[in-house]
């Protein structure tokens, strides 16, 4: 029985040994190694030769310090395996070892173990990315360190490799020469000088740690294009400075142009106020005082005595106060009127010869008197007022109207007539040339009232009136008018009387002296006005004429003077209508 048990054990042993011999028939993997980056640990092995489609590989991991192997995965047909999850503590441990075998059904191969220990020094150093930019002709780069997702929060590249980090930078120009420029920096920020070259530049970075033997891997190539920078900071500053200067110059020119063309203030003498349409409509023009021109009644004027018509009154503009101012009309031609009735003048001369009277002023050559002098009554008896012409030493320079009102104190008839407009004296009975045209003459002017102290005792009041002849050659005539009432005219106050022709007629030139008290309607040459019309109290002309009854006697000579002394002009002229 003992021999049966020995045979059974030998058979079992032979079966077991046969099974072991059959499992060793597959070849083992040629090599096993780790390829690790920062927190990316991969185990690689080499496949067995002549493997079938059913061949797979088993992996076991051994950590230093622990004696047993730890099977990591089931059989897989891949040639690599990611051990990152089971080796997270790699950077804080002594390292790991791994082994791999091939399995094909019931057969398997021997284990192939890594040749080296997998530690931190086996980790290949890399960078996450490289960022490039251009600034003032420099390429500025920034290295981004790797940030793996599976890494613990406290395990970063900076914390693990805290010292002696270095980066090697390679620059390549595309296109053109492909020479690389290598540069090492110790910081993640770097700058590269391009030397003014333009084109595309590509940069690569490889990290390293000076205190370790870790390998570094070149990063992915980053490229940037360089062109000529026209809008640099310097160029922009220069451009804006130029624009600012140009704007300032334009503003100055514009301001100067506006200053030159601005509306300037005119002098006050050149300012004209625009009339407002409302003011122009509302305001009415004020009436202006104008010279009154009266028409001449030629038929009535022919009835006036030739002595009164031919008197020289045109050149007189005297004020009557003895001023030496020359007349403004002395150079004007004299208007002389012929005497249409020479016989009447002789008859008048026989009855009452006119008296040649002296001027009221001492020197008639320089006199600018109006020529009308109203003498005070003399103590000697008088036959009546006479018309008397002023005769001076030099009648050519006289600016007198030629009318003088004096009183003949001696009562004698003058045997001499006034001189002509040319200044010569004529006999009492002149022969007026027949060829003279009997033109009708109208004049208006002022008559002066004065007292002649030199002739108070020698003359009675004579009113002498001169009328310029048309040709300037006729003699001057004087006529004395005797007041039929026999009253001596009182002394007259100094002043002016306006002579204004009205529609009144005078008696014919041949009438006797007593017939001068004609109705006022017959006077056309001399206008009669009442004494009450004289409105100026200083002259007191109406008061002095009250005894004469100038209002009661319309034919009186003194009533023929108009009293409009304010509004009418001083200088009068003779108007002749032919």
From Swiss-Prot:
Cytoplasmic side: 257-578
GO biological process, one term: cytokine-mediated signaling pathway
UniProt entry keywords in alphabetical sequence: Cell membrane, Cytoplasm, Disease variant, Disulfide bond, Glycoprotein, Membrane, Phosphoprotein, Receptor, Signal, Transmembrane, Transmembrane helix, Ubl conjugation
One Gene Ontology molecular-function label: interleukin-10 receptor activity
Biased composition (Low complexity): 357-371
Compartments in which it is found: Cell membrane; Cytoplasm
Composition-biased stretches (Polar residues): 316-332, 377-396
GO cellular component entries: apical plasma membrane; cilium; cytosol; nucleoplasm; plasma membrane
Membrane topology listed for this record: Single-pass type I membrane protein
InterPro entries from the UniProt entry: FN3_dom, FN3_sf, Ig-like_fold, Type-II_Cytokine-TF_Rcpt
Assembly with partners or alone: Interacts with IL10. Interacts with IL10RB. Interacts (via its cytoplasmic domain) with JAK1 (via N-terminus). Interacts with BTRC; this interaction leads to IL10RA ubiquitination and subsequent degradation. Interacts with STAT3.
Family: Belongs to the type II cytokine receptor family.
Recorded disease: Inflammatory bowel disease 28, autosomal recessive: A chronic, relapsing inflammation of the gastrointestinal tract with a complex etiology. It is subdivided into Crohn disease and ulcerative colitis phenotypes. Crohn disease may affect any part of the gastrointestinal tract from the mouth to the anus, but most frequently it involves the terminal ileum and colon. Bowel inflammation is transmural and discontinuous; it may contain granulomas or be associated with intestinal or perianal fistulas.
Protein name, UniProt field: Interleukin-10 receptor subunit alpha
Gene: IL10RA
């Amino acid at each position: 029985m003992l021999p049966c048990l020995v045979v059974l054990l030998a058979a079992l042993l032979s079966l077991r040994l046969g099974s072991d011999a059959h499992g060793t028939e597959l070849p083992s993997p040629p090599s096993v190694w780790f390829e690790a980056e920062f927190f990316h640990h991969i185990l690689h092995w080499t496949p067995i030769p002549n493997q079938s489609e059913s061949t797979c590989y088993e992996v076991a991991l051994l950590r230093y310090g622990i004696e047993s192997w730890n099977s990591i995965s089931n059989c897989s047909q891949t040639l690599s395996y990611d051990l990152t999850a089971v080796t997270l503590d790699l950077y804080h441990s002594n390292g790991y070892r791994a082994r791999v075998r091939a399995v094909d059904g019931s057969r398997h191969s021997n284990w192939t173990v890594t040749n080296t220990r997998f530690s931190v020094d086996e980790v290949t150093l890399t960078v996450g990315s490289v960022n490039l930019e251009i600034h003032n002709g420099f390429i500025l780069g920034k290295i981004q360190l790797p940030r793996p997702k599976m890494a613990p929060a406290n395990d970063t590249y900076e914390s693990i490799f805290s010292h002696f980090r270095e980066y090697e930078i390679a620059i390549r120009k595309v296109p053109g020469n492909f020479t690389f420029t290598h540069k090492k920096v110790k910081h993640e920020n770097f700058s590269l000088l391009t030397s003014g070259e333009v084109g595309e530049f590509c940069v690569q970075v490889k990290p390293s740690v000076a205190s370790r033997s870790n390998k570094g891997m070149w990063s992915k190539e980053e490229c940037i294009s360089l062109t000529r920078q026209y809008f640099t900071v310097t160029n922009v500053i220069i451009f804006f400075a130029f624009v600012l200067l140009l704007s300032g110059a334009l503003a100055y020119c514009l301001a100067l142009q506006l200053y030159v063309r601005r509306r300037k203030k005119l002098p006050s003498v050149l300012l004209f106020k625009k009339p407002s349409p409302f003011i122009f409509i509302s305001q009415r023009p004020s009436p202006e005082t104008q010279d009154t021109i009266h028409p001449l009644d030629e038929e009535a004027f022919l009835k006036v005595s030739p002595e009164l018509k031919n008197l020289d009154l045109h050149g007189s503009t005297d004020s009557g106060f003895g001023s030496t101012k020359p007349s403004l009309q002395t150079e004007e031609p004299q208007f002389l009127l012929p005497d249409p009735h020479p016989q009447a003048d002789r008859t008048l001369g026989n009855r009452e010869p006119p008296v040649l009277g002296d001027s009221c002023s001492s020197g008639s050559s320089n006199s600018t008197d109006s020529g009308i002098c109203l003498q005070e009554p003399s103590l000697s008896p008088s036959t009546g007022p006479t018309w008397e012409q002023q005769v001076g030493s030099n009648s050519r320079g006289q600016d007198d109207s030629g009318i003088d009102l004096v009183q003949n104190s001696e009562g004698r008839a003058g045997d001499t007539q006034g001189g002509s407009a040319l200044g010569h004296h004529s006999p009492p009975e002149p022969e007026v040339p027949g060829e003279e045209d009997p033109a009708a003459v109208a004049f208006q002017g002022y008559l002066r009232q004065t007292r002649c102290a030199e002739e108070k005792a020698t003359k009675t009041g004579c009113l002498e009136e001169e009328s310029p002849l048309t040709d300037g050659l006729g003699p001057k005539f004087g006529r004395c008018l005797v007041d039929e009432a026999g009253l001596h005219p009182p002394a007259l106050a100094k002043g002016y009387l306006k002579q204004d022709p009205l529609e009144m007629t005078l008696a014919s030139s041949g009438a006797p002296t007593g017939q001068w008290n004609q109705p006022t309607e017959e006077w056309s040459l001399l206008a009669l006005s009442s004494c009450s019309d004289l409105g100026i109290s200083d002259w007191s002309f109406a008061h002095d004429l009250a005894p004469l009854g100038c209002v009661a006697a319309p034919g009186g000579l003194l009533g023929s003077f108009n009293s409009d002394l304010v509004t009418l002009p001083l200088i009068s002229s003779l108007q002749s209508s032919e």
